[in-house]
Amino acid sequence: MFRGTSYHRIDPKGRIVIPSRFRDLIGADGTAMITFFEGGLYAYTLEEWSKIEAKMVMLEKKGNQMRRFRRFFIGRASECQPDKQWRLLIPPELRQDAGLEEEIVLIGISDHFEIWSRAKWEEQKNLHEDDMNDEDFQNEIEKLGL
């Protein structure tokens, strides 16, 4: 499972270094499927990506919104393989959409990891703090036993 937060820099060529704790999870060849979602990049192992694609087939029948979601989530994904230094080259369009410039944050989220610009990550942290002040949300968290 992907866990933890790492602060890094994206180099001028658009490469990011995969943290060592993520490398074994990605697999021997290190290939990751990366797509844009909710303002950041989501990176999946090929195994997890196959599961997502299988689920997405059903979205075709659920109307225009779901069809568009599938089109952009799957259609914009890019298969990225690291070099010998475990650097992934993020395609320019994905870098631009996610606002990746210099400082980035990698966050492990169980079945995938996310790549955020430092500025957008700070915004997400602020939203989380706001969520934690919401009584209904706090009740949902309590139901999880946390």
UniProtKB/Swiss-Prot annotation:
Q: Where is the SpoVT-AbrB domain?
A: 5-48, 77-120
User: Which SUPFAM superfamilies does the annotation name?
Assistant: AbrB/MazE/MraZ-like
Name its cellular compartments: Cytoplasm, Nucleoid
One GO term describing the cellular component: cytoplasm
Example of a GO MF term:
DNA-binding transcription factor activity
Q: Which residues form a coiled coil?
A: none
- PROSITE patterns linked to this entry: SPOVT_ABRB
UniProt entry keywords in alphabetical sequence = Cytoplasm, DNA-binding, Repeat, Transcription, Transcription regulation
InterPro entries in UniProt: MraZ (IPR003444), MraZ_C (IPR035644), MraZ_dom (IPR020603), MraZ_N (IPR035642), MraZ_sf (IPR038619), SpoVT-AbrB_dom (IPR007159), SpoVT-AbrB_sf (IPR037914)
Q: Assign the protein's first listed, main location to one coarse class.
A: cytoplasm
Presence of the UniProt keyword Cytoplasm in the record:
yes
GO BP annotations of the record are: negative regulation of DNA-templated transcription initiation
How this chain assembles, per its entry, is: Forms oligomers.
For this protein, the record's PANTHER family field holds: TRANSCRIPTIONAL REGULATOR MRAZ (PTHR34701:SF1)
Instruction: Name the family the entry cites.
Output: Belongs to the MraZ family.
Name of the featured protein? Transcriptional regulator MraZ
Which organism does this sequence originate in? Desulfosudis oleivorans (strain DSM 6200 / JCM 39069 / Hxd3) (Desulfococcus oleovorans)
Gene transcribed to yield this protein: mraZ
